[in-house]
Design a protein with these regions (language model features):
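Extracellular and secretory-pathway beta-repeat/beta-biased strand scaffolds
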Residues: 1-275
Length: 275
């Protein structure tokens, strides 16, 4: 993919919809001097990534879709830098500007250096689901209202950060998308008890998870449910890893390997599920 708007060392792309079909690849061109590529989806549909998503160069790739992101069983990543996927509605920058997916008519970005964080302030954040093999050379970050990964997450030389957060949260980042900390609302922010994950996967027939008659997501064969604010992880390989759930953190037949720190954080329960 070519084009976009260059501002300093950043390249900005906007899409009405963004999907990668099974067996196909979508690669962002990486002009000289570009260190980070920021892409936002301004339409009303989730992104379905069923093929390979990558960068033709060393730039970090950020994908923002407030409607949800689904990585299918054949999905893979091919960036030489870091990857961040989020259902936040906006990226925040050091000069006070935002790259918003829900308010794309804001004044154009002029001079932007590095992102400071992602912001969730448009109701219950949508879900991210991964059933594929997501691997990066540097950092791999998935940030949503619910994050369920029954596939592979791999960043042997970097950080893997997976976080499920409530509306009103701001997540602070490094210049490469590494999660630094989470500023969650202390109180007063209503939560939607419906399942954004169910909406994302209900017609997909994907392994490990199913949507029951009450439109809630369950682990196949267990009866345990996944609600908004949960994180589900199966295979994680990284230098360091931080898995943060607003509600429950569930490790499904998990194989988690790190050479450095491993942080498992849950507002409610950490569950280990085997079949």
């Amino acid at each position: 993919m070519e084009g976009g708007a260059i501002r300093g060392a950043n390249l900005f792309h906007s899409f009405q919809e963004f999907n990668v079909r099974d067996g196909r690849g979508a690669y962002f061109n990486n002009p000289a001097g570009i260190e980070s590529i920021f892409s936002r989806v301004t339409g009303n549909n989730a992104s379905n990534i069923n093929g390979k998503l990558g960068v033709l160069g060393n730039a970090n790739l950020f994908l923002l879709n407030p409607n949800g992101i689904l990585f299918g069983p054949n999905a893979s990543l091919d960036p030489n830098g870091s990857f961040l996927g989020s259902t936040a509605n906006a990226l925040k920058f050091g000069d006070g500007k935002e790259f918003s997916a829900t308010n794309p008519t804001t004044p154009p970005l002029l001079s932007v250096s590095v992102p400071l964080g992602v912001q969730f302030n448009q109701g219950q954040p949508s879900a991210i689901a991964n059933f594929g093999n997501l691997s990066t050379r540097q950092n791999l970050t998935l940030l949503g209202g619910t994050v369920a990964s029954t596939g592979q997450l791999s960043a042997p030389e970097g950080q893997i950060a997976v976080a499920a957060v409530p509306n009103g949260s701001v997540l602070n980042l490094s210049s490469t998308g590494q999660l630094l900390n989470i500023a969650a609302p202390s109180s007063g922010v209503p939560e939607n008890l419906s399942s954004s994950l169910a909406e994302l996967i209900q017609n997909s027939n994907l392994p490990g998870l199913t949507v029951n008659s009450n439109e809630q997501v369950e682990f196949v064969g267990s009866g345990l449910s996944v609600v908004d604010g949960d994180v589900v992880a199966k295979n994680v390989i990284a230098k360091t890893a931080t898995l943060t759930a607003h509600h429950n953190l569930t490790l499904v037949e998990s194989q988690i390997g790190t050479t450095g720190d491993l942080n498992l954080l849950a507002g409610d329960t950490v569950r280990v599920l085997g079949y």
